[in-house]
A protein has these predicted regions:
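Charged, amphipathic alpha-helical linker segments immediately N-terminal to NTP-binding catalytic cores
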Residues: 103-158
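Canonical P-loop GTPase G-domain recognition
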Residues: 287-290, 297-350
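Switch I (effector-binding) loop of TRAFAC-class P-loop GTPase G-domains
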Residues: 169-172, 194-224, 228-248, 271, ...
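Post-Walker A alpha-helix
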Residues: 190-191
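N-terminal accessory targeting/assembly segments
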Residues: 1-109
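Inter-motif core of Ras-like GTPase G domains
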Residues: 238-265, 276-285
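Pre-Walker A adenine-sensing motif
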Residues: 159-170
Length: 350
C-alpha cells in the first residue's frame, strides 16, 4: 500500500472513522457473502461452481478490508509534511511515534492480507471442489488473525481522531500574535475589543478553556491573535515537561508576543510577580515581545496617587510600553497601530 497522504487545506487532521477489528471483519465477510450469492446464481459447470463461490468470497473479503485500511492510511496526512506547530501538537496530544507505528501496522496488515488473497485464491482454484469451503474457512481464520493483531493500532488511531478533530485552525500566512500574562489581567477583554468577530475556540493541551483565536484585517494584512488560558499565565517552574512542550509549540506560531500587565494588581498578582513571568517568557520565545499595562484607569496612576511611583517603577523598566484600559476601550487604536508594525517571521513549515 502506498503511503501517500495529503495535508488538507483547512489545516485539520481529518482522520476518518476508525473501525474495530470485528467491525472491519464483519464488513468484509458480509460483503463476501453477498458476492457468493451473486456467483451462485450464475450458470457454470457444477464442479467449478463451489470453487468459484469460495474464491470470490476470499477475494471480496480481502479487497473490502484492504480498501478500508488504505482509505485510513491515505486520509491521514503525512506528519512530516505538516507545519511544525501541528507536529508538536500531535506529539503532545497523541504521540507522533505511536501514530507512525499504528499507520505502519496498517501497512503491514495490508501487505499480509494481499498475500493471503493471492495464496488462497490459487489454492482454491487448484483444489478439489469438496475442499474449497475448508480452504476458504482457513483463509478467513488467517485474515481474522491479522486484523486482530492491529487491534491496538486501530485503538490508537481512534484515540487520535477524537483528540485531533478539534485542533486549532491556523492560518500560517497570517501575522500571528500570542497573548500572555497572568489570569484576569484583561486578555479576553482585549481580544474581544480588537478582533473583528467572536474568537474561535479550539482544543489545546493544558489550556483551561481551549485556545482562543481572533482575527483582524488591517490594511490588507491578516492578523490572528491567540490566547491560551491556563498556559502562558503562570510561572514556568510550575509546569511539567509536557506542559513546557505545549508552550514551546507556540514558538512555531508567534510573530510577536503581546504581554499584558495588570497595573492595578486586581488580578491578584503583584507587579513584581507579573514582571518575573515576563522575564521567563522572554527566555523561551525568540519572537519580539510587546508590552501593555492594562487597567490604568483604576491603578491610581493618572491621578498621581499613592501608587504612582510604585507603578511607574515597573513601567520605566519597559521600552515603549502602551498604557491602556481594555474595559474602557482606551488605547485600542494604539494597540492596532502596534500590531500593524509586527513583521511576519519566515518559517519553513512545508
Amino acid at each position: 500500500m502506498k503511503n501517500k497522504k495529503k495535508f488538507f487545506g483547512d489545516k485539520k487532521m481529518m482522520i476518518p472513522t476508525i473501525p474495530t477489528p470485528d467491525e472491519l471483519l464483519d464488513k468484509g465477510f458480509s460483503r463476501a457473502k453477498k458476492t457468493a450469492s451473486e456467483v451462485r446464481s450464475k450458470k457454470m459447470p457444477k464442479r467449478l461452481k463451489p470453487k468459484k463461490i469460495e474464491e470470490a468470497r476470499v477475494i471480496t473479503a480481502c479487497q473490502v478490508i484492504k480498501d478500508r485500511l488504505k482509505m485510513i492510511n491515505d486520509r491521514v496526512p503525512t506528519i512530516e509534511e505538516l507545519p511544525e506547530f501541528y507536529q508538536d501538537y500531535i506529539d503532545i496530544t497523541v504521540g507522533v511515534d505511536d501514530m507512525k507505528q499504528a499507520l505502519g501496522a496498517l501497512n503491514w496488515a495490508y501487505g499480509i492480507i494481499t498475500q493471503l488473497e493471492k495464496d488462497y485464491s490459487k489454492k482454491i482454484r487448484r483444489s478439489p471442489p469438496e475442499k474449497a469451503s475448508t480452504l476458504r474457512s482457513q483463509a478467513y481464520g488467517r485474515i481474522s488473525s491479522v486484523v486482530h493483531k492491529i487491534s491496538k493500532d486501530l485503538d490508537i488511531l481512534d484515540f487520535a481522531k477524537n483528540r485531533l478533530r478539534n485542533m486549532p485552525t491556523i492560518d500560517f500566512e497570517a501575522t500571528t500574535i500570542v497573548i500572555a500574562g497572568f489570569p484576569n489581567v484583561g486578555k479576553s477583554t482585549l481580544l474581544s475589543q480588537i478582533t473583528d468577530a467572536e474568537p474561535e475556540v479550539a482544543d489545546y493541551p493544558f489550556t483551561t478553556k481551549g485556545i482562543q483565536i481572533g482575527h483582524i484585517e488591517r490594511h490588507w494584512k491578516h492578523i490572528q491573535i491567540i490566547d491560551t488560558p491556563g498556559l502562558l499565565d503562570r510561572p514556568i517552574v510550575d509546569m511539567n515537561d509536557i506542559e513546557m512542550n505545549a508552550m514551546v509549540a507556540l514558538e512555531d506560531l508567534a510573530d510577536a508576543i503581546l504581554f499584558i500587565f495588570d497595573s492595578s494588581e486586581t488580578c491578584g498578582y503583584p507587579l513584581e510577580q507579573q514582571f518575573n513571568l515576563l522575564e521567563e517568557i522572554e527566555e523561551i520565545f525568540n519572537a519580539p515581545i510587546k508590552i501593555l499595562f492594562n487597567k490604568m484607569d483604576i491603578s491610581d496612576y493618572y491621578n498621581n496617587g499613592s501608587r504612582f511611583e510604585y507603578v511607574n517603577n515597573f513601567i520605566e523598566k519597559i521600552e515603549e510600553p502602551l498604557l491602556i484600559s481594555a474595559m474602557e476601550g482606551k488605547g485600542i487604536d494604539e494597540i492596532l497601530k502596534l500590531l500593524d508594525s509586527v513583521k511576519k517571521i519566515e518559517r519553513e513549515d512545508y
